[in-house]
């Protein structure tokens, strides 16, 4: 009985303390709501609110990104504050959120000068200290340069073209036997096999299957609530990261023990760099494996999903790719000129990247008090350049939530389009952007010319923190005769 009374007293005391904290916070918020705009104007901060204690407005952001209207979080605040730049509180940090394309362009172009990359600690724990999102300064520029060199146009044209087609054909051969597949899961494994070959010179094998299995837990952790308790999705992801790093470390040791064996991959290039430690190499390789397969595999899935819901676009895609087959005299290897001739396919790719929003935005931290347009952002504040908000903005894209690849027919050169940033920008522009486009185009060509399909589930995507389909887009395949 005494124990029960003691427990009740503890619970009661905790409840009173919590209510007291909430009361103090509520009073502060009432005062803040009366004066926040005046204070922000004095500091030249945008208008806004920090939301609830601890969680801020993270839940509102999460709810929006898991709905079929991912821009709702932005829309609500743009109306409330009459501004497309506002103050919020996300993932434990006060932040300036921007859906203004000019503001975002300035943030991206001034990486290293006024801003530096800043991501939530839970994500950084998965990426590691030396993933490309985590490093700064000279090391970031060096690692980014190595990745760009690996994926230069000459390699895409003469190496990747053939390797991608071989892998896609061999993968689709296995799909024929299955009849029914979850496209999202199959694309993940296929693209991960491609990246494993380019980064670690690994062909599909038991080793790559083990890596793929570990990447399931690793990737799930990236899109999970970061609760580090035994058995949680996040904890499993951290364990998967540990095992993946161990595998890469063992490969490094094996390369050093057998220097006479020649490999043509990124790991060989990194081992030639005396200034790069093994720890940096492991984190860098793991990040590229993750980033290199995530965008491409998800884009493949979403492209097929969008085409499935738009018969007119699918018919035009079939016509374009059937014409390529006819000109080549059947299912022969595509060459670079064939790829460059896929005009409507590029429209489909652009629209898939716009509507799929595979890189929602970038987090940056101010290195000093920084003036952007009419805002003065204090040193140490987080800035979230919400790139996908522009992609889904009715001001820039008519019927923005509708899949309409024809909107790109007169605007296929998107290299200088600040309203379209699927691969980020500035010094951290994704080094694999051209590879992702090539992979997607070749996959679409082979898939569409070989198969008819029937979708087995109707589901809307979730966009938090990365776009995905919870059921994996299950489908039944039929050989196309």
Swiss-Prot record:
UniProt function note: Multifunctional and multisubstrate cytochrome P450 that oxidizes the respective carbon 18 of abietadienol, abietadienal, levopimaradienol, isopimara-7,15-dienol, isopimara-7,15-dienal, dehydroabietadienol, and dehydroabietadienal.
Disulphide-bonded residues: none
Similarity remark: Belongs to the cytochrome P450 family.
EC number, UniProt record: 1.14.14.145
CDD domains: CYP90-like
Keyword Transmembrane helix part of the UniProt annotation: yes
Membrane association type: Single-pass membrane protein
Location, primary (coarse class): membrane
GO terms, molecular function: abieta-7,13-dien-18-ol hydroxylase activity; heme binding; iron ion binding
SUPFAM superfamilies: Cytochrome P450
Organism domain of life: Eukaryota
Induction profile: By methyl jasmonate.
Alphabetic keyword roster: Heme, Iron, Membrane, Metal-binding, Monooxygenase, Oxidoreductase, Transmembrane, Transmembrane helix
Lineage, highest ranks first: Eukaryota, Viridiplantae, Streptophyta, Embryophyta, Tracheophyta
Transmembrane segments: 2-22
GO biological process, one term: brassinosteroid biosynthetic process
Tissue: Expressed in young tissues such as flushing buds and green bark tissues. Lower levels in mature needles and bark.
Gene3D superfamilies given in the database record: Cytochrome P450
A GO cellular component entry from the record: membrane
Intracellular or extracellular location(s): Membrane
Annotated Pfam families: p450
Name of the featured protein: Abietadienol/abietadienal oxidase
Organism: Pinus taeda
Recorded effect of pH on activity: Optimum pH is7.5-7.6.
């Amino acid at each position: 009985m005494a124990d029960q009374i003691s427990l009740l007293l503890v619970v009661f005391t905790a409840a009173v303390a919590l209510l007291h904290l909430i009361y103090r916070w509520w009073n502060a918020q009432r005062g803040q709501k009366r004066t926040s705009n005046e204070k922000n104007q004095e500091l030249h901060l945008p208008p806004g609110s920090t939301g609830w204690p601890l969680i801020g407005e993270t839940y509102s952001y999460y709810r929006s990104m898991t709905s079929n209207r991912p821009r709702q979080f932005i829309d609500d605040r743009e109306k409330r504050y009459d501004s497309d730049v506002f103050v919020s509180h996300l993932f434990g940090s006060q932040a300036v959120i921007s859906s203004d394309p000019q503001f975002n362009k300035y943030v991206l172009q001034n990486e290293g000068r006024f801003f530096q990359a800043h991501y939530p600690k839970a994500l950084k724990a998965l990426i590691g200290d030396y993933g490309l999102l985590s490093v700064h300064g000279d090391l970031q520029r060096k690692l980014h340069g190595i990745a760009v060199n690996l994926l230069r146009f000459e390699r895409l044209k003469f190496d990747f073209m053939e390797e991608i087609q071989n892998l896609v054909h061999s993968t689709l051969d296995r799909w024929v036997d299955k009849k029914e597949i979850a496209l999202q899961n199959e694309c993940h494994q296929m693209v991960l096999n491609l990246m494993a070959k380019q980064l670690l010179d690994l062909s599909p094998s038991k080793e790559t299957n083990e890596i793929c299995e570990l990447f399931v837990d690793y990737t799930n952790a990236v899109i999970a609530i970061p609760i580090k308790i035994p058995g949680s999705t996040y904890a499993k992801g951290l364990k998967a990261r540990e095992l993946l790093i161990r595998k890469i470390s063992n490969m490094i040791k094996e390369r050093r023990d057998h220097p006479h064996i020649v490999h043509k991959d990124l790991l060989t290039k990194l081992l030639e760099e005396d200034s790069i430690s093994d720890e940096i190499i492991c984190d860098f390789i793991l990040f590229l494996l993750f980033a290199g397969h995530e965008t491409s595999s998800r884009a493949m899935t979403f492209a097929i999903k969008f085409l499935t819901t738009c018969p007119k676009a699918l018919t035009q895609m079939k016509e374009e790719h059937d014409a390529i087959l006819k000109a080549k005299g059947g299912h022969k290897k595509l060459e670079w000129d064939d790829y460059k001739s896929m005009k409507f396919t590029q429209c489909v790719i652009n629209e898939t990247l716009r509507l799929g929003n595979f890189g929602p935005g970038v987090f940056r931290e101010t290195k000093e008090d920084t003036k952007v347009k009419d805002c003065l952002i204090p040193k140490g504040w987080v800035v979230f350049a919400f790139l996908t908000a522009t992609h889904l903005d009715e001001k820039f894209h008519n019927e923005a939530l509708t899949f309409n690849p024809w909107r790109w027919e007169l605007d296929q050169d998107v290299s200088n389009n600040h309203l379209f940033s699927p691969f980020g920008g500035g010094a951290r522009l994704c080094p694999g952007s051209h590879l992702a486009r090539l992979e997607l185009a070749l996959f679409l060509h082979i898939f569409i010319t070989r198969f008819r399909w029937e979708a087995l589930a109707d589901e809307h995507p979730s966009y938090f923190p990365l776009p995905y389909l919870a059921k994996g887009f299950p489908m039944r395949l039929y050989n196309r005769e």
